[in-house]
Amino acid sequence: MPIYKMDKKKDGVQKYRVRINYTDSKGEAHQMDRVAYGLAEAKELEARLIFELNNKSNSSKMTLQELSEEYFNAKKHEVRETTLDKSRRLLNSNVLSLLGEVRLDKLDAKRLQKWKNEISEKDFKLKTRQNIYGDFRSMLNYAVKMEYIPKNPLLTVGNFKDSYDFTTPQDKLHYYTPEQYLKFSAVARDSARSVKEWGYFAFFAIAFYTGARKGEINALKWSDIEGTTMHIRRSVAQKIKGKDIVETPPKNKSSYRDIVIPQPLMTILEEHKARQKAMPGFSEDYRVCGGIECLRDTSIENKNKAFAKAAGLPHIRIHDFRHSHASLLCNEGINIQEIARRLGHSKIEMTWNTYSHLYPREEERAVQILNQIK
């Protein structure tokens, strides 16, 4: 790694060329040339370039497991704890379990395509596979940002696609019609023989009549209800490793919202609150559905299955009560912007892409209007 004296000078100061020869992780030879003025500056430049190359070489020998630890430590200051925990679980189960010991400089397209094929063979929905890819891509983008690798090799193999999935969005959407919900609700009410059981009855009523998310409903306190208005200001998560229940902000800025409570739900909440008030230590800080503590996700799902079975209804997910709320409003022709607002969607396109097929067909009415122009 010599320093060459050049013919040219600048203001009487000798000009030097610093030349560094090195081999990259693929075994290819490279040469780096830099110019310095004065022998002291040239030696300093040489030392710095050697240090940077060695540091870069060592970084490229970092394993994916080691990278993930640094990545998660950096991300914890940028995203919500629940988001980070979900990303960690996805990467641990589907990336690090397969590639954790692979060095960054050995992570090539062939190895990544093999990984992608393995994930494709798992019984995952397309969205889940794409979420895994997205988190993996984000981690490798971090490696590029930190100059551990020159480019993201995952981009070469591309995201997951499902060319055999011809199911339309409406075929995938599950929800209860108003008639089905009333059957479900009747069973839930009949089983509500205690204050806690009433909490489950109230939970499903809130889900259907407001379209709120599970975590938002579970986080609700009586202080969040003023008259006939429900204020969505927080959420709770129950799947963060090493923790019980964590209260978090809502999913996004649009999720902070006020929802007018319809009368059927208001009647249920008033009766439920009267029952809770009889409990020792009641306060406005009580959770609407759980009282002192939030209802457990597993318990909510168990009740959901039991009520559906008793009512002779197909089982739908907790999140599908949100779809039930939205589908009812769509079928009644409610403006898509209002539905997006009630659901707390950050983009109206999300609401439209999910529910537009539920709107009443306007073709016949459009033709009638045009037929009048003669």
Where are these regions (language model features)?
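Catalytic-site neighborhood detector that most strongly recognizes the C-terminal catalytic loop/helix
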Residues: 78, 235-236, 266, 343-368
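N-terminal DNA-binding module of tyrosine recombinases/phage integrases
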Residues: 9-110, 274-282
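N-terminal core-binding DNA-recognition domain of tyrosine site-specific recombinases/integrases
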Residues: 60, 72-148, 153, 170, ...
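C-terminal catalytic core of tyrosine-transesterase DNA break-rejoin enzymes
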Residues: 145, 201-216, 303-308, 322-346, ...
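Basic, Lys/Arg- and aromatic-enriched nucleic-acid-binding interface segment
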Residues: 126, 130-134, 145-151, 155-214, ...
